[in-house]
Regions:
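Loop/turn elements at helix/coil->beta-strand transitions in domains of secreted/extracellular proteins
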Residues: 11-15, 58-62, 89-93, 130, ...
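Acidic/histidine-rich catalytic neighborhood of metal-dependent amide-processing enzymes
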Residues: 1, 25-121, 142-145
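Acidic/His- and Gly-rich active-site-bordering loop/insert found
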Residues: 1-27
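Active-site-adjacent substrate-binding region
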Residues: 104-203
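Sec/Tat-exported extracytoplasmic proteins
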Residues: 6, 19, 25, 50-57, ...
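Short, glycine-/Ser/Thr-/acidic-enriched flexible segments
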Residues: 9, 22, 69, 101, ...
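Generic beta-strand/beta-sheet core signal
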Residues: 18, 65-67, 97, 157-160
Length: 203
């Protein structure tokens, strides 16, 4: 796992941004799976969020975690959930980003039980700003790195863009930067920023 922290003005709570940087890698001597959509895209979003908060000092500490082992049964996130740098009880919200480089106008998401209390804020922001045609909320599943935290009562949301033109390259050797679609990159970034600002203004 690779972890960065941007210190906020307060240290009693924090936000956490996660994405896995591993992929399938090599298969034999000649076959290589690049993993641009899955999940260089999500990793790029959390790096952009980190750059934003370096320039704009946040109210609370921010943790940016690039997990390894997601494609090996969530090993990296499971380990971190058992050995967190800050108590899990201090997490105001965790955002997990996986496969963002597609062009489906509806954004797939999963929300933990504890995250549902503030989920209407995501819907309100999206309705006002029109970032996505809709937020397509699905049942919580153990398919990405938010899951170990959801099981430990952390408020979290998982964003993934699937079903567009890039999805046909999922887990293939053609998941390359040439097939990377950036149209939902900024809307995802902006929705998260607006959510944090909206949560702060309501405190």
């Amino acid at each position: 796992n690779v972890i960065a922290k941007v210190e906020g003005r307060r240290h009693d709570s924090c936000y956490v941004f996660t994405a896995h940087y591993d992929h399938l890698g090599k298969l034999g001597k000649k076959t290589f799976y690049p993993g641009a959509h899955d999940n260089a895209s999500g990793t790029a979003v959390i790096m952009t969020l980190a750059a934003h908060y370096v320039k704009n000092k946040p109210e609370y500490d921010m943790y940016f975690i690039a997990f390894s082992g997601e494609d090996a049964n969530l090993r990296g996130s499971e380990w971190y959930a058992e050995h967190p740098l800050a108590p899990l009880s201090q997490i105001k919200y965790l955002f997990n980003l996986d496969m963002i480089a597609d062009n489906n106008p509806a954004q797939y998401c999963e929300v933990s039980n504890e995250g549902m209390r503030l989920y209407p804020l995501f819907e309100k922001i999206n309705a006002e700003k029109g970032y996505f045609k809709e937020l397509d909320r699905n049942e919580l599943d153990g398919n990405s790195d938010h899951y170990p935290f959801a099981l430990r009562n952390v408020p979290c949301i998982f964003f993934m863009n699937e079903g567009g033109d890039a999805f046909k390259y999922y887990h293939t050797i053609y998941d390359t930067w040439e097939n990377f679609i950036i149209s939902n990159y900024e809307p995802t970034f902006s929705l998260i920023i607006d959510f944090i600002n909206g949560q702060r203004s309501s405190e």
